[in-house]
């Protein structure tokens, strides 16, 4: 391992959401394990949560042959500002401040002997590639959904095929290299009636800048989405590097990106027989209505299965009410049920006691399930989840479908919940799903070991970053300082207070 200052330095900028931070931090750890110095940054409002919940510090942490370090920046708003929950307000604010502060951070790193050679961002903040271009640095982007969803958004953005519209709400969508998607299997942010148009705008914003990154990294693997990846690689410079949550060069690294401390539930799982526990978690952003929560609770009770259920409290500014369990639920469940606020999901899915995963089908959870050989009960709600559910159930054949998503506007009854749990844990279909899940686990493991498809792609990316770093060093002694215009913008947009807090200038 080289010294920190001698390593090629990449700078990762993350949108401050749990589903964005985790995969980008996982990529950072993989890059560090390949011998790079990685700096990870996101707004300080999230940095505080990460310091509290995860094992991160201000000192560079060794990972494999390299290091990872953290720097956070103020987004110009007070810590308790509720407008962060409104992306239409927060994304412009983040861009305004980020375009000022990120160049300053990069310049400071150069002055301290850590010149940056590449910037990498995830979706919702495509302006990072503008910053890189201004500084004369190459940039890359990590796509945090499936390649199938990337291709769907690409075709929608460029108007290449018909999608559901106000005049044709229920048309099916045929995309190249993909199975026919029913209208409610298309990423739901593309529906004309989506209640989340701001998320459609946020995702499609990346496609406006898609020609600037020299590489689009994807948290998937060649064997999983082979035909789609082959097609997409002809129109965009993609490299599959997943599953990112596995890091063979640093399997025991304790650096995590969680915003909440996980509750201790592994000891409870240890006390249960093999393949006897249903794991229920709907991720970090999905919140169901109370009546649906009640039906799931009674379905779990009536099924007779052991269960571990994650009930994450909503953000205080989200507008959601805290969900409650039916009266007497925990007493009736007894020791066969455990309810927690957050879990160490990777460990839970890898535990021999876990039989199946009731999931919202977000891509992070989908990849973790497939890589762990875990069958799923698909409970998608919106966004890419409905497309992921289509693939998990119909294409990868590792799941039972419990619902079709929020657009269905249908209460899933306790009887349906019970039936799906039994189907996923008992009988011939459960055995077939487990067999298929183990097949995908083997394929995933083969992709990230040394010489596997994802490992080769990641190494090729690292080699390209190093090559470009040599070119940058040869062309100038240090990273280009922020242009005068950017510095002037800094003076007009933000003020740094005596306590280090950055605020919008009056």
From Swiss-Prot:
EC assignment: 2.4.1.136, 2.4.1.120, 2.4.1.170, 2.4.1.177
Gene Ontology terms: cellular component: cytoplasm
CDD domains tied to this protein: GT1_Gtf-like (cd03784)
Pfam families associated with the record: UDPGT (PF00201)
pH dependence per the UniProt record: Optimum pH is 5.
Residues where UDP-alpha-D-glucose binds: 345, 360, 363-365, 368, 384-385
Temperature-activity profile: Activity remains fairly constant between 20-55 degrees Celsius. Active even at 0 degrees Celsius.
Homology family: Belongs to the UDP-glycosyltransferase family.
This protein's name: Gallate 1-beta-glucosyltransferase 84A23
Organism: Punica granatum
Lineage: Eukaryota, Viridiplantae, Streptophyta, Embryophyta, Tracheophyta
Name of the gene encoding the protein in the UniProt record: UGT84A23
